[in-house]
Every structure is written in structure tokens, then in C-alpha cells.
Amino acid sequence: MPHDLDTALAGISGILVTPYDDAGEIAPARLAPILDRALAAGVHMPVVNGNTGEFYALTTDEACTMVREVAALLDGRAPLLAGVGRGVRDACRLARASAEAGAAALMIHQPPDPFVSPRGTVDYVKAVIDAGGGLPVMLYLRNDAMGTQAIADLCALPGVKGVKWATPNPLKLAAAIDACDPGITWVCGLAEIWAPPLYAVGARGFTSGLINVWPERSAAIHAALARGDYTQANHLIAGMRPFEEIRAEEMNGTNVTVVKAALLTQGHDCGPTRPPSAWPLTDAQQARLDGFLAANELA
């Protein structure tokens, strides 16, 4: 089934968790009801091997399996965005596996290597694009310290369709948008809470981990922003802010923990998170999460 990739990129990029079984092995089949619920609510583009999917806790073999299995679960119902990254050879291998699985586009994680040069990043992205065999690419930018010109150089590479902007710097985003081809889609990579200020300078769409638990709220926020109703969007965001506040604790180390704990409360056992993510929630965190879920009739 054909899909409009540009429309999907400017929609909700729903970052799926990676479920584990009782032995700690990946269990992608457990995503089926979560994925079905997200699609029914209107999530535009599921994302596999993102940070909410504990990408850096997975082996490359596991990440390759996840993209194949999620593509099979999705079965063409929406375009699949597949995260790739780590060492360049791992990233290229995962790009090839993602293309073979039927992903619609690649999301290239910004290299976390301590010794990264802007021009080396260009070479890295070129290699991954080549390995992807022509799949469109979204760049995942979590650090804008490379500067506007370096960002523009990356966006000028053939195949780059969008940027997942995950830094809380709207003015730098505005400068980057001005410096790049107007055909590039700039997506808020900091979830629902940061969507309004980044929309104000030109971003469209946002990433979401909430979609695993409450996709209807994510869809309502996107709809409000799409019609320019910032008052309603902010009202809806206020209602889900406690969820994101708990996720941001412990240096963001409870980010995935909260999502998996909420899913467990909803009857979807996706296992624990892997270290170095925190597991389980503290009693105080769990009590706040339980209160949030109860207040919104989510459990």
C-alpha cells in the first residue's frame, strides 16, 4: 500500500518500545496490540530501533530482527521509519537489513562517539545512505554544536528528506531551516511538550513515546497543532505533562522505564528495561504514574 512519506514525516513518529520475554530476549510479537492501538488512533509513522526502543541496549543482530519483525507486524498499514546507528559498519548493516525488511525510510542516529568531526559525520551519513540502497533518510540531531553550516552540509546530501531536531534550541532550529533546502521536513524530536515552540519556528510533526500508552492524546495534540490551535494543544499537553516529567527523572534514565511500567499496568507486559536504564521505578515514581493513569482512565 503506497503512503505519502512527506505527510508521514510531518505527522507523529511513534517510537515503539522493544519488548523482552521472561528470559530477557527480544519479543517483538508482544508489540502487536500496542501497534494496532497506535495505528487506530492515527499515528502516522511507527519507528523501530529508536531511543524509546532502547536502541543502544540492543545488539546489532537484535536490531536487525526487530526491524524485520515490526515490518511484518505492520504489514504495509503505515510507513515504517527504521533507526540505524552506532559504528559505521553496524549502521550500514542495519541500513541494509531495514531496506530488505521494507522500511520506508531510515532514521540515522547522531554518532555518540566522543571524537566526532562535522566532515566525518558527512562521510558517516553518506556511507549509511549508500548502504540503504536509496531509502530516504531522516537525520536524528541531538547535539547542534556542530553549527548551522555543518547541519546544512548534511541536509544537502542526496536522499536526506528530514531532520529530527532533538535539541531545545528554537532559534538554532530557525537558523538551520533558513540555511537548508525548503524541501527538508523538520520534526520536533523532543516529543509533545516541545512541539509548540518548535512548530512556531517551522517544525512540523513530533516524535512520541506516549503513543505506546495513550496514542489518542498524541493524535489530538497533533490535530490541534495542524490547525494552528496552540491554546488547545497546550491544554492537551498539560494533561500528559506528568508522564513526561517522570520520564525525565534520573538524567532521563527513567524515560523508557515509565513507558514499560505503564504498559505493564495496562496489561501489556513488555518486560523490564535493560541497564543502564533505571528499573524498576521507585515507589514514589510508581505512585505518581499510577495516579496519572487512573486520572486519565488509562488503567
What are these regions (language model features)?
Residues 11-17, 35-37, 41, 200-202, ...:
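C-terminal alpha-helical cap/extension of soluble enzyme domains
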Residues 112-113, 159-160, 274:
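Glycine-rich phosphate-binding "P-loop"
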Residues 31, 63, 67, 91, ...:
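A general structural signal for well-ordered alpha-helical segments in protein cores
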Residues 41, 65, 69-73, 97, ...:
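Alpha-helical structural signal in soluble globular domains
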Residues 2-145, 278-279:
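Active-site beta->alpha loop and helix N-cap motifs at the rims of alpha/beta catalytic domains
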Residues 58-61, 93-94, 118-121, 150-151, ...:
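Short secondary-structure transition/capping segments
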Residues 133, 142-244, 248-251:
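Catalytic alpha/beta core domains of metabolic enzymes, predominantly
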Residues 14-17, 27, 53-56, 86-88, ...:
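Short, flexible micro-motifs
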